[in-house]
């Protein structure tokens, strides 16, 4: 079979986020399945016959019974740390509970964060080609796909998810590898910091399942202050959050202090750049002739850009550090939680994309070389 004939069926698009996996068929508008990228294992003894079957829970089932389970994320900062669990999750995507299809029938478009170790991509290819017999594979950078979803060919994408934040400048469809910036500060770090702040208020969330409660508190009540110093001096309105056991828990200044780590990683003792610096450095590393255009086409993507006040805060930080008359435009598409997946769905269904796939035959002939030759 020629590599070009491989792509007859609808490709499967998997946006492999550190926090949430989005998967579905190319050409559709939204991902068919979306579930947390973790595995749950029972931490108690099963004493009744006919109780919950199985020793490993994935997807909605793990979410539903999380109080019984010890929860582990197989990905940390965009890099797979536990391949056995990651492969279980990928196999589950094809099960009858999710896409209900056969692995050997569909090419796979997989997303990954830029500047990831090469080994990460090689192991993924090994699983899809050798483990589940996929006919073809392509590994694409997340930010490029987000730009596809907005219908632009020029812009700088600031993508901040659960594990990684990165900025990728793209001009007329060309990504500039030397200008890509990445920091490993993202949503999960905000959740961890919020957990610490909540502990100071007298609530201790210890277990891995309770960490998920902190995550949902973050998603519901946290916001970014345009001026954090000013915000500290005024009384923050307390928000009453109802915990799963019915207790009411009041959260005050932690609401804006937690997301602050995105702009000030030093609060966590990290020495890396804040999210606004990542964006600016990435633009400044691009060619001088392109900078003005890039500043006018900043596109936000990923769940951590959904904090209330995120766009305003980013704009005020950029204005502080740039020329007075510089025009800055930030586009925040409403569907940015899914924009990487949507871009993948558009890309994989294009006719011109067919020659980009790495076919199983190419992989068998060239091995890992094929993966690096055909992916950016």
Swiss-Prot record:
One of its GO terms (cellular component) is axon cytoplasm. Its main location: cytoplasm. Keywords: ATP-binding, Cytoplasm, Cytoskeleton, Nucleotide-binding. InterPro entries: Actin (IPR004000), Actin/actin-like_CS (IPR020902), Actin_CS (IPR004001), ATPase_NBD (IPR043129). GO terms for molecular function: ATP binding. It is found in: Cytoplasm, Cytoskeleton. The keyword Cytoplasm applies. One of its GO terms (biological process) is anterograde axonal transport. The keyword Hydrolase does not apply. Signal peptide: none annotated. Belongs to the actin family. ARP1 subfamily. This is Actin-related protein 1. It comes from Drosophila melanogaster.
